[in-house]
Amino acid sequence: MMLPKPGTYYLPWEVSAGQVPDGSTLRTFGRLCLYDMIQSRVTLMAQHGSDQHQVLVCTKLVEPFHAQVGSLYIVLGELQHQQDRGSVVKARVLTCVEGMNLPLLEQAIREQRLYKQERGGSQ
């Protein structure tokens, strides 16, 4: 049995800027600002400098799910580029992590990337 890939951490602004290849397994984070139950979609927002970045997430595989608007979430899933709406993460896991230290998570992602580069691995 083939297990899915564990998912590379990408920062939300990298996902929204189109820096993640189509079909990639990824992990990212953001504050849940909108949950559309009818379309099974969540919008996660993240602040980077003075800019707000959105990540759209399809929640069909993780429903039923209790959305807590304003709370911090981490999503694990596959990225699908769509012609009309940009990119959508098809969530396999969507976890509320309210209270997590975001600057520390961002630092850990940067440190992990640096470590993998030094070892000759990919991002």
Swiss-Prot record:
An example of a Gene Ontology BP annotation on this entry? negative regulation of telomere maintenance via telomerase
Q: State whether keyword Flavoprotein applies.
A: no
Subcellular location(s): the record lists:
Nucleus; Chromosome, Telomere
Query: Could you tell me one molecular function GO term of this UniProt entry?
Result: single-stranded DNA binding
- Identify the DNA-binding region of this protein by residue numbers: 2-123
Nucleus is among the record's keywords = yes
Q: Which Gene3D superfamilies match?
A: Nucleic acid-binding proteins
Q: Which UniProt keywords apply?
A: Chromosome, DNA-binding, Nucleus, Telomere
The family assignment reads: Belongs to the TEN1 family.
The record's subunit annotation is:
Component of the CST complex, composed of TEN1/C17orf106, CTC1/C17orf68 and STN1; in the complex interacts directly with STN1.
> Could you tell me what this protein is called?
CST complex subunit TEN1
Native organism: Homo sapiens (Human)
